[in-house]
Design a protein with these regions (language model features):
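Short secondary-structure transition hinges
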Residues: 95, 102-141, 152-153, 160, ...
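Amphipathic C-terminal alpha-helical segment
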Residues: 102-106, 110, 142, 146, ...
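Generic hydrophobic, amphipathic alpha-helix propensity
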Residues: 13-25, 42, 67-75, 79, ...
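Short hydrophobic clusters on alpha-helical segments that form packing/core surfaces
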Residues: 17, 21-29, 100, 170
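N-terminal intrinsically disordered/low-complexity leader segments
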Residues: 1-16
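Hydrophobic alpha-helical connector segments
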Residues: 66, 80-109, 162-166, 186-189
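Helix-turn-helix
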Residues: 20, 28-62, 66
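Amphipathic alpha-helical packing segments from all-alpha helical-bundle domains
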Residues: 73-77, 123-150, 160-167, 171, ...
Length: 198
């Protein structure tokens, strides 16, 4: 059965409103921090009413979790998609690390939410952050697991530990250099690849 055009227009209008709220929340949480940012700040920037905000989100934290899940999830998806194009484990690891670094430098608001603002905020936010990190770490671990039998560098590495080490080190390096300029994304990615995918 076809959906009436009036319903389609209404759904599109609601989605545009929700998107404005998500974009405003991302900008505010990244620039001011979660604690300082209020729902009023978000709705003012989004140019919507508070009631519009609460149509989509139960609370400020619910909004933060949704933004982190959507925007952080999109970033991780880009990383894993590019990594999958590599012809071998070295190429896939290098592509994944490099894409993560570039995406974070190109989308610093998302990086700030994923790497800084979400840490220790609440159980719910931590669960989202850990799920996103696990997707990246699990992909790295799988590459290491497959490389152990034919690559001496990875032969003695625990895949799960190596995957988490990559995510931790890469995230920390990106977080540091986003707030302490002095290195570009390509140089940072190259340095990290020398360590983890020589």
């Amino acid at each position: 059965m076809a959906v009436p055009s009036a319903q389609l227009r209404r759904d599109a209008r609601l989605e545009r409103r929700r998107r404005r709220i998500v974009e405003a929340a991302l900008a505010k949480f990244a620039s001011r921090g979660y604690t300082v940012t209020s729902v009023d700040d978000v709705v003012t920037r989004a140019r919507v009413s508070k009631s519009a905000f609460y149509e989509f989100f139960e609370s400020k934290e619910h909004c933060f979790r949704a933004v982190l899940h959507e925007e952080g999830g999109a970033l991780i998806h880009e990383v894993l998609t590019e990594a999958a194009t590599g012809h071998d484990h070295h190429a896939r690891l290098r592509l994944g690390i490099s894409r993560f670094v570039r995406e974070c430098f190109e989308r610093p608001d998302v990086a700030r939410l994923l790497i800084v603002e979400s840490v220790g905020l609440s159980e719910g936010v931590e669960a989202v952050r850990h799920e996103l990190q696990a997707r990246f770490a699990d992909a790295v671990a799988e590459e290491v697991r497959n490389a152990m039998t034919h690559d001496a560098f990875y032969a003695d590495k625990d895949p799960a530990v190596f995957g988490r080490a990559v995510v931790g080190a890469v995230s920390d390096a990106v977080g540091y250099f986003l707030t302490h300029p002095g290195v570009d994304a390509e140089s940072l990615a190259a340095s990290l690849c020398v360590i983890f995918a020589p």
